[in-house]
Regions:
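Active-site hotspot residues in diverse enzymes, especially metal/ion-binding acidic/histidine motifs
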Residues: 1-184
Length: 184
């Protein structure tokens, strides 16, 4: 994961949408860690592990008005690669929610939206969904507060490991967050 170029206006828009999503599901103050599956469930999604190939992290399917996706009684489904670590699974769920919040309206075809995430594919939408996930799981103010509370003598790697454990996200996501927020 490396940081990507995005306009400040786009970043602000995504940050606001992530904060609005947390507020919509009832979070007044963001807990650490965010219960991302509860967030997804509150937005109407069923979430589960899926048998996917190694290069596929997850997928999202939305079929408005239908209540059957792959035999599951739902019109919104997020599937995550069952082989990923718990921290990565959390990030994948948040990433797929990012696709829904940010891209559903522009990409839905007659109420149907399906998207599969390949590890090798990184484009503007993927980067935006990653940024949404980071803001949902590690909101700027909360992340900065926790980062600033760490002892100064700790190195970048140690800080990343501690914050990854606290936010229950992959260490790579924390390192990318360092870059996004220009901390250190």
């Amino acid at each position: 994961m490396t940081a990507f170029k995005m306009t400040e206006e786009k970043k602000n828009d995504i940050e606001k949408k992530a904060a609005d999503t947390l507020e919509k599901v009832g979070y007044q103050k963001t807990p650490v860690p965010v219960d991302v599956v509860t967030v997804a469930n509150t937005l109407g999604f069923a979430v589960g592990n899926a048998s996917l190939t190694e290069d596929v992290d997850g997928f999202i399917v939305v079929k408005e008005g239908e209540k059957n996706i792959f035999g599951i009684n739902t019109d919104k489904l997020i599937g995550i690669n069952g082989l990923r670590s718990f921290a990565w699974k959390r990030f994948i769920v948040a990433h797929e929610l990012g696709h829904y919040v940010l891209h559903y309206d522009e990409m839905a075809d007659h109420g149907i939206y399906a998207h599969r995430d390949h590890q090798k594919e990184k484009n503007a939408q993927e980067n935006e969904a990653d940024y949404f996930a980071a803001n949902l799981l590690m909101p700027k103010e909360t992340f900065a507060e926790r980062y600033n509370a760490l002892p100064d003598e700790l190195g970048r790697e140690q800080k990343a490991i501690l914050l990854a454990a606290e936010f229950v996200v992959p260490k790579d996501a924390v390192i990318r967050r360092f870059e996004e927020l220009s901390v250190e």
